[in-house]
Amino acid sequence: MRVITWNCGGGLRKKLDIIESFKADILVIQEAEDPALSTIAYRDWASNYLWVGTNKNKGIGVFSKYPLRSLNWNAEYSIAGIAHSKAKWKTSDLETFLPFECNGQVYLAVWTKSGGTDSAFSYIGQFWKFLQLHKADIKRNDCIILGDFNSNVRWDKHDAWWRHTEVVEELEQLKFGSLYHHQFNEAQGVESEPTFFHQYNLNKAYHIDYVFMPNHLLGT
């Protein structure tokens, strides 16, 4: 199976030739339009898809020639000993995640966002919260986690416990690792291959997209 994740930056309907050239079996696309509310040509191309988002122009789209099944992962979590509204959350509070199954394999499509009013837990904080809710689901299903995390260990804040470093450590405790870092034998934060160029500027290169999978799938 060839699986590709890509933040298309919007306007996927205008970039179909690009993505088709990779001949993927599964496409996980961030900032994709909702095919149901877009052009007929785009809807016909999508045909078999899943989509979630709060803006019809930019959400997570999953496209495949194989049957797709959305998974209804819902849970609530609270941090013990902290009496604050921000210390309790549920799956639907977080953006943006789409668990799905294809050909017997479970995937979690990721596009972390600013968190709206929950700005303290923006981007990687959104995934950290999701991880607290769904560790058992991820572990039990040998889930492949992939997408745009908008995060890198270089941006860790010293006063947060939901930093990129802690997320990677929690995944390692579940016996999950990063596909890129395994293949390239590089440490987090010193990636030689960027996945994003801010404002399309080659001098603003960052590595913010990841695939995490069980160690036994990595061959470790």
Where are the predicted features?
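Structured beta-strand-rich core segments of catalytic domains in phosphoester-bond hydrolases
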Residues: 32-113
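Active-site-proximal loop/helix segment associated with metal-binding centers of metalloenzymes
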Residues: 107-122, 169-172
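Short, flexible loop segments at the rims of nucleotide/cofactor-binding pockets, characterized by
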Residues: 3-10, 85-88, 120-124
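Active-site beta-strand/loop signature of hydrolases that rely on acidic residues for catalysis
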Residues: 3-7, 18-38, 107, 130-157, ...
